[in-house]
Amino acid sequence: MNAVTESAATTTEMPAPFVFTDAAADKVKQLIDEEGNPDLKLRVFVQGGGCSGFQYGFTFDEEVNEDDTVMNKNGVQLLIDSMSYQYLVGAEIDYKDDLNGAQFVIKNPNATTTCGCGSSFSV
C-alpha cells in the first residue's frame, strides 16, 4: 500500500501523484456520513469501455487492497489500484455542482482525447 497525505503541515519526499480537491473530499465526507459507515473510502478506477476506449469509475469500498495507493484528505480516503494509477497519475479529482449538474470530475493530463460525456478518454 502506498500512502499519500495532502496537508499544509506535512512535507512529503515526492509530490502527490493526484490532486484530490477540497470540494471532492467534502462531498465524499458528506456521502459517507449519509451512509452511516465511517469505514467507507472512495475508490477511483479506470476500466476499458466508453466511446474513447477507457472510462472512469467511482465506488465506495471498505477494504484497502495491497496494491492500492491511498490519499488522505480532510478526513476521507481516496483509493486507486495499481492498474488505474498509471492512467491517473497527475490527475485532479474534483466535485462540481453547477448548471450542468452535480458530479465528480477528473482532469487528466494523460488523456489525449476525451468524449463529450466527460467520463471516457484515450491515452
Curated annotation (Swiss-Prot):
Q: Name one GO biological process term.
A: iron-sulfur cluster assembly
Cofactor(s) it depends on: iron-sulfur cluster
Free-text cofactor note: Binds 1 iron-sulfur cluster per subunit.
Q: Name one Pfam family in it.
A: Fe-S_biosyn
Cite a single GO MF annotation: 2 iron, 2 sulfur cluster binding
Q: Where does iron-sulfur cluster bind?
A: C51, C115, C117
Is-annotated flag, keyword Metal-binding? yes
Keyword line? Iron, Iron-sulfur, Metal-binding
Q: What top-level branch of life does the organism fall under? A: Bacteria
Give the multimer and partner information.
Homodimer.
> Family per UniProt?
Belongs to the HesB/IscA family.
Protein's job: Required for insertion of 4Fe-4S clusters.
User: What is the protein name given in its UniProt record?
Assistant: Putative iron-sulfur cluster insertion protein ErpA
Natural source organism: Burkholderia multivorans (strain ATCC 17616 / 249)
